[in-house]
Amino acid sequence: IVRLDHFRGFEAYWEIDGKAKTAVNGCWRKGPGKAFFEEMEKSVENLSIVAEDLGIITDEVEKLRDDCGYPGMKVLHFCLNFNEMRRVGIAVPENSIVYTGTHDNNTTVGWFTQDLDAPERAAVAELLNARADRPKDICDKLVEFAYASNARLVIVPMQDVRALDSRSRMNVPGTVGINWRWRLKDFAH
């Protein structure tokens, strides 16, 4: 399985001048579209692609993903939807790959304890039938929730398998220095 990061760029991408100091002044350009994937499929037998469809996703990006038949990504930290009454819901399409989190966001324990406010934590705990004062149980239940979904495949980062807190976070986008240092030292615990 190959995960294509920034799949949206195959539909349209943000072009900037190579000499620009920031990416503010650019414009959208059409990407290669479905023709690129048709050529890939001619060259590679049993091509198995996951479209990373996170970020600015337009109807055109979704159409390209669907026309190609590729599953998209659903990250539970991002796709739990809180309504105005602070109730939570989620819908996971069958043609998707579900992640509890990715290398670019907090661990599930860290997400629950640091990234959500009290009403959101209460709503997630209620959804998972777990106690909000037990973040490791919340993590385990979210993993179970992922496996019970309609998704084609579930991917759980090792930090969530072990119910580790934010000290085990892999990467904080836009920062330097402390990223990519986490290592699994002992799987037995």
Each PLM stretch: what is its role?
Residues 1-189:
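Catalytic cores of glycan-processing enzymes that make or break glycosidic bonds
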